[in-house]
Amino acid sequence: MKGLWLENNQLELRTNIPIPEPPPGEALVRILRAGICHTDLELIKGYYPYTGIIGHEFVGIVEQGPQQLINQRVVGEINAACGTCRFCRRGQPTHCENRTVLGIVNRNGAFAEYLSLPIENLHLVPENVSTAAATFTEPIAAALEIQQQIQIGKDDRVLVVGDGKLGQLIAQTLALTSCELLVVGRHKEKLTNLSAKGIKTGLADSVTDRYFDISVDCTGNPEGFNIARRALRPRGTLILKSTYAGNLSLDASSLVVDEITLIGSRCGPFVPALELLATEKVDVQYLIDSYYPLSQGLEAFEKAKTKGVLKVLLEMSS
């Protein structure tokens, strides 16, 4: 089969990759569409020493697996857990000590014609959700994880730093809490999309220091982190939603003096993410910049790296 293979920070299209043979408890999924995200771009930069097929945001058709899933559209949670380690026993499978992670850690990913994933990771796509929209399930779930980690209500002042793909989804999900929300970024056209949805926006240099209860950094760069940090009141909460390819320097003393809570935030719940798509409470269509066939995957990555581009989707089959 064809797939986008990453090795030594070099991405190439391979045409002779064996179709995976699912072990017991896993299903074979034929990929329909997959989305390129910030983590994929960071992998190429070397943030994690991964070799294999990359990609983790996908929609596919089950070809081998339980009868009730055959020929059904599915999306999949990316962490494959062992079920027996201390984190799994605590109900924290995303931190399984023996986990593999789709397209990121020791498991071939979604930028190929097929993948294998544990059956328990798969979720049916509602009939009224398009295949293109369903590719956003994983990042919407990641956005929702914030509300799994911290309670946010109408009296909270919340800042989102970053107007990219994830920032747009986080903004939409946080807006549903009725909090006092501000989203800042560097791209007026991206901020306009959120303003049209009734979400308050501004440029990054307009943030008032020490005003917000909660700030969310979606940028993955030191400048975004510093903006999010300066915006927090004492005993505020800083949530990090993006991976960093390099080291991050910070003033640890100020975190101590202001008693700042620092939260890393990764994968989230798929069921409510699919519900938001099915009820159209989150809009994703405007985020799609372009579609590329898998055979033009390298060109798709160049497009995804382009400044101002939001989501690029790969089409594996119809």
Question: Language-model segments: what does each one mean?
Answer:
Residues 226, 271-318:
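C-terminal hydrophobic helical "lid"/dimerization subdomain
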Residues 83-161:
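NAD(P)H dinucleotide-binding glycine-rich loop of Rossmann-like/cofactor-binding domains
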Residues 33, 216-218:
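Short, well-ordered coil/turn residues at beta-beta hairpins
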Residues 222-281, 316-318:
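Glycine-rich phosphate-binding loop and adjacent beta-alpha segment
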Residues 129-204:
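Mid-domain Rossmann-like dinucleotide-binding core that forms the NAD(H)/NADP(H) cofactor-binding site
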Residues 207-215:
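A short acidic, Gly/Pro-enriched loop at the edge of an enzyme's catalytic core
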Residues 19-34, 44-86, 126-128:
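Glycine-rich beta-strand-centered segment in the early N-terminal region that forms part
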Residues 75, 216, 239:
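N-terminal Rossmann-like NAD(P) cofactor-binding module of classical short-chain dehydrogenase/reductase
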